[in-house]
């Protein structure tokens, strides 16, 4: 579809964004839906964020994704936040609504959708271990508690940060128990059988880097493992799950699902089911 003066603009801001697969899947969906939009990546340095947001608003951009390192820093630059973005403390989607820029967070929704579609896993009543305490962990913990998890334990190198995250969500989700433990392989190996789901939200394992010392053999076949890292497709953590006969999934489904939610927010139309995920998988296999 040729671009004209009537073409509406969507995009993604971050630094770096050259590696982002969002333009690929979003433009493929827009073309399949016959919508006159273009989705463009914008590299934005941290000290230029405010100028970039003002510029995008002035140019009439319909909406944009927000990625590292701007998901939290952008909040004070927006006019309003969705309840999810406010609770998580981060926005990965911005939509222009009248003269306002409104921040949303579709990461949690995408994560829960991927758990269901890729693992057949429902968090309600389950005991869950989340590794990491950064922005991705905040979205995961909030969505798991919101879906009725019985308990969420946060394992992080800085236990103080894990405890801070636990305390923040404990006030909002009284039906879920929260705790924090050190992200220490020996400690995790001893207690892994106590969990129904293990979620890695950290960057450990990205690019095939080793996940030191993990032994999931005590978890048993009832458990499940989710790694938000998706390059490589089978990370060291997922390879360990496979060795132990535990069902597992990587983060490609979450990336696709949050993108579907974002596109529906911007256009009011749900993209064809499975299209974004198929685009991503084809790109990663090529």
Swiss-Prot record:
Active site: 71
An annotated GO BP: aromatic amino acid family biosynthetic process
Signal peptide annotation: none
CDD domains: NAD_bind_Shikimate_DH
SUPFAM superfamilies tied to this protein: Aminoacid dehydrogenase-like, N-terminal domain (SSF53223), NAD(P)-binding Rossmann-fold domains (SSF51735)
Catalysed conversion reaction: shikimate + NADP(+) = 3-dehydroshikimate + NADPH + H(+)
Residues reported to bind NADP(+): 132-136, 228, 251
Cellular component per GO, a single term: cytosol
Pathway recorded for this protein: Metabolic intermediate biosynthesis; chorismate biosynthesis; chorismate from D-erythrose 4-phosphate and phosphoenolpyruvate: step 4/7
Keyword terms, alphabetized: Amino-acid biosynthesis, Aromatic amino acid biosynthesis, NADP, Oxidoreductase
Entry EC no(s): 1.1.1.25
Function: Involved in the biosynthesis of the chorismate, which leads to the biosynthesis of aromatic amino acids. Catalyzes the reversible NADPH linked reduction of 3-dehydroshikimate (DHSA) to yield shikimate (SA).
Family: Belongs to the shikimate dehydrogenase family.
Subunit annotation: Homodimer.
Name of the protein described by the UniProt record: Shikimate dehydrogenase (NADP(+))
Native organism: Geobacter sulfurreducens (strain ATCC 51573 / DSM 12127 / PCA)
Gene label: aroE
């Amino acid at each position: 579809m040729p671009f004209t003066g009537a073409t509406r603009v969507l995009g993604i801001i971050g630094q770096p964004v050259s590696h982002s697969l969002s333009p690929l899947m979003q433009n493929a969906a827009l073309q399949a839906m016959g919508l006159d939009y273009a989705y463009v990546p914008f590299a934005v340095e941290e000290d230029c964020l405010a100028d970039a947001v003002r510029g995008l608003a002035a140019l009439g951009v319909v909406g944009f994704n927000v990625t590292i390192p701007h998901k939290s820093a952008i909040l004070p630059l927006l006019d309003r936040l969705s309840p999810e973005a406010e609770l998580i403390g981060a926005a990965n989607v911005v939509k222009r609504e009248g003269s306002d820029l409104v921040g949303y967070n579709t990461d949690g929704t995408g994560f829960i959708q991927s758990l269901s579609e890729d693992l057949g896993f429902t968090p309600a009543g389950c005991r869950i271990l989340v590794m990491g305490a950064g922005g991705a962990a905040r979205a995961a913990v909030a969505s798991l508690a919101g879906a009725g998890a019985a308990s969420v334990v946060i394992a992080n190198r800085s236990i103080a940060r894990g405890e801070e995250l636990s305390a923040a969500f404990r006030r909002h989700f009284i039906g879920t128990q929260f705790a924090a433990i050190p992200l220490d392989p020996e400690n995790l190996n001893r207690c892994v059988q106590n969990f129904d789901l293990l979620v890695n939200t950290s960057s450990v394992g990205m690019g095939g880097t080793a996940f030191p010392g993990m032994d999931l053999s005590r978890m048993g076949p009832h458990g499940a493992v989710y790694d938000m890292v998706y390059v490589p497709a089978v990370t060291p953590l997922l390879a360990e799950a496979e060795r132990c006969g535990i069902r597992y999934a990587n983060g490609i489904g979450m990336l696709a699902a949050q993108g579907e939610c974002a596109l529906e927010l911007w256009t009011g139309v749900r993209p064809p089911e499975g299209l974004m995920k198929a685009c991503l998988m084809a790109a990663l296999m090529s």
